[in-house]
């Protein structure tokens, strides 16, 4: 802007300044009659004022086309103009009138509760703040919740958890640093711009602080999105590596084999004693409570669908019979049958052991001829096979009216069925 923005001084030494821009004829800035001070009548009423306003508007429209050097030159001319203090005082008066409405609308906004929750979670997981082993603490807590010591597999998984948590922490801090850097750069740019404008128009320090808070609120949306995505990544990581319920759900194949073998060999009374539970827990590498829960669930599933588990019972019957036959190969007397026999399905030996011919073993191979001959020898005339008379090694036991298990009146080693598989009730005991 040049001197024309503030209005040229009137001819003849009249009052100059802002009042002359767009003054009407007969006003305080022009003599009556709209002519020259000398009394001439050649002037057009209001013509010069309209021309000045048109020139000002034209200059405003061309501001965006100015180069940086031209803008600096015009800014310097404005600051050096003799009417600059008067213009600044007028702007201050206008600001005082409108300042009340600005102050009344300015209120301190409370901290977002969602942002506080995200910050607390990131601190608890060891992602935000100084690294104090938050991931290790979370892994240890999950291991304690699983109800047992830390096995080698668990220790490997916990090591993977800590490694991936460190990656999440690194990504979070690097992105947060980029966000803070961008926010600081933009805030600095705005503050420099306001300081430069304060030389032309009144800008209070409180207004600068308010503008900084507005900028931070705008950037806080990016910060919240970053923290929320980081929390989601941590929760997914915890569900994959530290879910205690998933650890309790799966047993190893060897542990399941040991538990099933005990269950079907004690099918007449599948309630292991505390000593037996401790022994099974030691063999399987699990806790006593897990053994109790497994037997309770197994009894319920077996009674609800006895036909489904008949094939599984037959497999364990074959295993037991083969082990008995191998143990009695060197003796002339018949082998001793299992102490607590009984199974969900019938298994006819027919006294000769011919049924084992051509039957695949548990691992997919056929039984050797030596084992078959040994079994025939042990199941020969007058032996255990004739005693049961083509009966069953394992047979379903009677079930009490209240749904419990009942011992048969026959000897504990060999029994015959008294009730078909259809008579099944749900097990309500533990």
Curated annotation (Swiss-Prot):
Gene Ontology MF terms in the entry: chromatin binding; DNA-binding transcription activator activity, RNA polymerase II-specific; DNA-binding transcription factor binding; RNA polymerase II transcription regulatory region sequence-specific DNA binding
Matches recorded under SUPFAM superfamilies: Homeodomain-like (SSF46689)
Pfam families associated with the record: Homeobox_KN, PBC
Entries under Gene3D superfamilies matching the protein: Homeodomain-like
Gene Ontology CC annotation, any one: nucleus
Swiss-Prot/TrEMBL keywords: Activator, DNA-binding, Homeobox, Nucleus, Phosphoprotein, Transcription, Transcription regulation
Compositional bias per record (Gly residues), positions renumbered to this chain: 13-48
Chain segments carrying region PBC-B: 137-243
Cell location: Nucleus
Domain PBC: 48-243
Regions of compositional bias (Polar residues) in chain numbering: 409-418
Region (PBC-A) residue spans: 55-134
One BP annotation, GO: positive regulation of transcription by RNA polymerase II
Residue range(s) of DNA binding per entry: 244-306
Modified residues (Phosphoserine): 136, 151, 159, 330, 395
Annotated segments matching region Disordered: 1-52, 327-347, 375-430
Coiled-coil stretches noted in the UniProt entry, renumbered to this chain: none
InterPro entries per the UniProt record, alphabetical: HD, Homeobox_CS, Homeodomain-like_sf, KN_HD, PBX_PBC_dom, TALE_homeobox
Description of how the protein assembles with itself and partners: Forms heterodimers with MEIS1 and heterotrimers with MEIS1 and HOXA9. Interacts with PBXIP1.
Similarity comment: family membership: Belongs to the TALE/PBX homeobox family.
Physiological role: Transcriptional activator that binds the sequence 5'-ATCAATCAA-3'. Activates transcription of PF4 in complex with MEIS1.
Protein name: Pre-B-cell leukemia transcription factor 2
Organism: Mus musculus (Mouse)
Organism lineage: Eukaryota, Metazoa, Chordata, Craniata, Vertebrata
Gene name, Swiss-Prot/TrEMBL: Pbx2
């Amino acid at each position: 802007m040049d001197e024309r923005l503030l209005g040229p001084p009137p001819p003849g030494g009249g009052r100059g300044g802002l009042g002359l821009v767009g003054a009407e004829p007969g006003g305080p800035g022009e003599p009556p009659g709209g002519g020259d001070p000398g009394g001439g009548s050649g002037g057009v009423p209001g013509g010069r004022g309209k021309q000045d306003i048109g020139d000002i508007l034209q200059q405003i429209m061309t501001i965006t086309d100015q180069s940086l050097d031209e803008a600096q030159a015009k800014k310097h001319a404005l600051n050096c103009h003799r009417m600059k203090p008067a213009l600044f005082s007028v702007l201050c008066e206008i600001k005082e009138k409108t300042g009340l409405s600005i102050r009344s609308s300015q209120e301190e906004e409370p901290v977002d509760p969602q942002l506080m929750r995200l910050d607390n979670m990131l601190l608890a997981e060891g992602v935000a703040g100084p690294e104090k082993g938050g991931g290790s603490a979370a892994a240890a807590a999950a291991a304690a919740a699983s109800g047992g010591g830390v096995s080698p597999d668990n220790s490997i998984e916990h090591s993977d958890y800590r490694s991936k948590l460190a990656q999440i922490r690194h990504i979070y801090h690097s992105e947060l640093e980029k966000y803070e850097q961008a926010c600081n750069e933009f805030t600095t740019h705005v503050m420099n711009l306001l300081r430069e404008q304060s030389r032309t128009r009144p800008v209070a320090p409180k207004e600068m602080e308010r503008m900084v808070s507005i900028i931070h609120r705008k950037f806080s949306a990016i910060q919240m999105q970053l923290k929320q995505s980081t929390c989601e990544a941590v929760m997914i990581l915890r569900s994959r590596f530290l879910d205690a319920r998933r650890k309790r759900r799966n047993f190893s194949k060897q542990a399941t084999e040991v538990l099933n073998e005990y269950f079907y060999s004690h099918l007449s009374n599948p309630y292991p004693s505390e000593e037996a539970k401790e022994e099974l827990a030691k063999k399987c590498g699990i806790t006593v409570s897990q053994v109790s829960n497994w037997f309770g669930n197994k009894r319920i599933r077996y009674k609800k669908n006895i036909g489904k588990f008949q094939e599984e019972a037959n497999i364990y019957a074959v295993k037991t019979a083969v082990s008995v036959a191998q143990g009695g190969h060197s003796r002339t007397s018949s082998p001793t049958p299992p102490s607590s026999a009984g199974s969900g399905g019938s298994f006819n030996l027919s006294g000769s052991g011919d049924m084992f011919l051509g039957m695949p073993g548990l691992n997919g191979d056929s039984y050797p001829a030596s084992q078959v001959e040994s079994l025939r020898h042990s199941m020969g005339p007058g032996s255990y096979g004739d005693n049961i008379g083509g009966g069953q090694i394992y047979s379903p036991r009677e079930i009490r009216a209240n749904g419990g298990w009942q011992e048969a009146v026959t000897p504990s080693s060999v029994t015959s069925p008294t009730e078909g598989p259809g008579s099944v009730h749900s097990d309500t005991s533990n």
